[in-house]
């Protein structure tokens, strides 16, 4: 009998494989994405010091009251995290898509972050 594939387990394996190759530094931190069924979260992380430099999510007060599709809200999260990162002096980042396909909400967030000043 064929066992059912757990998509999240496959994603976590893919993410672990990618994380072995990616690391954020103080000069070029990592933009990490987490996507749930309802929300999306983005963090700019300096892996050397283990600190989060900037973050944004759809659960924040200013974004939680917004209406629109999940893709539109993801773009607003990308815009917000890019502005917060640039306030901290971050211009270039390493994009960590968290094992998710570069499509839909993840792509919208990345494009919005690029349009608002982050380079990757």
Swiss-Prot record:
This is Large ribosomal subunit protein uL18. Pfam families: Ribosomal_L18p. Keywords: Ribonucleoprotein, Ribosomal protein, RNA-binding, rRNA-binding. Part of the 50S ribosomal subunit; part of the 5S rRNA/L5/L18/L25 subcomplex. Contacts the 5S and 23S rRNAs. PANTHER family: 39S RIBOSOMAL PROTEIN L18, MITOCHONDRIAL, LARGE RIBOSOMAL SUBUNIT PROTEIN UL18M. One of its GO terms (cellular component) is cytosolic large ribosomal subunit. One of its GO terms (biological process) is translation. It comes from Staphylococcus saprophyticus subsp. saprophyticus (strain ATCC 15305 / DSM 20229 / NCIMB 8711 / NCTC 7292 / S-41). InterPro entries: Ribosomal_uL18_bac-type (IPR004389), Ribosomal_uL18_bac/euk (IPR005484). HAMAP family: Ribosomal_uL18_B. Belongs to the universal ribosomal protein uL18 family. GO terms for molecular function: 5S rRNA binding; structural constituent of ribosome. This is one of the proteins that bind and probably mediate the attachment of the 5S RNA into the large ribosomal subunit, where it forms part of the central protuberance.
